[in-house]
Amino acid sequence: MAKNYYDITLALAGICQSARLVQQLAHEGQCDNDALNTVLRGLLQTNPSSTLAVYGDTEQVLKMGLETLQSVLNANRQGEAAELTRYTLSLMVLERKLSASKSAMNTLGERISQLDRQLAHFDLESETMMSSLASIYVDVVSPLGPRIQVTGSPAILQSPLVQAKVRATLLAGIRSAVLWQQVGGSRLQLMFSRNRLFKQAQSILAHT
């Protein structure tokens, strides 16, 4: 069956957008709020009509992720680009561990469905919601291992709010990685279909 590289690239961009946001948070203590909102909202889409619907039905909101994906595919193994590649691959590894555990997947689904009650009272980007999302990551994903080593400014990373945002963003990255697998993504494509993925990202970016 032919792979749908459009859907695969969108889901990859979702993973990469989370990776870039984690990097921004770890180094600067803040991040692009619109890009963050996009990946966090994706967590709440449990029955989307399409891959794009997970992110809000517009390619524009994945611009950061598509640009980051191109950077990862360019295989720059230095500095910040190497960090992005490490985060992206680590999220993919964790997703495989999560998907292999039926009980963890069930718990994750239950915990995410419970967020609706809180969202009736709090904004998605509020400290309360960040804390709730972070606790889901700590309780459900972290025990599966291996831990994702987040590097940045030690002073910034000591902030409880930054820690919560980083974990919430990693959880959103896992959601995109689950989607990526569902639409036919695999790590082999990052080696053998690099050109095709790069061109697909370029093509989508041309419309944004």
UniProtKB/Swiss-Prot annotation:
One GO cellular component term: plasma membrane
Subcellular location, record wording: Cytoplasm; Cell inner membrane
Pfam families assigned: DUF489
Highest taxon of source: Bacteria
SUPFAM superfamilies: YcfC-like
Keywords attached to this entry: Cell inner membrane, Cell membrane, Cytoplasm, Membrane
InterPro entries in the cross-refs: HflD, HflD-like_sf
Protein name: High frequency lysogenization protein HflD homolog
Organism, as annotated: Yersinia pestis
Higher taxonomy: Bacteria, Pseudomonadati, Pseudomonadota, Gammaproteobacteria, Enterobacterales
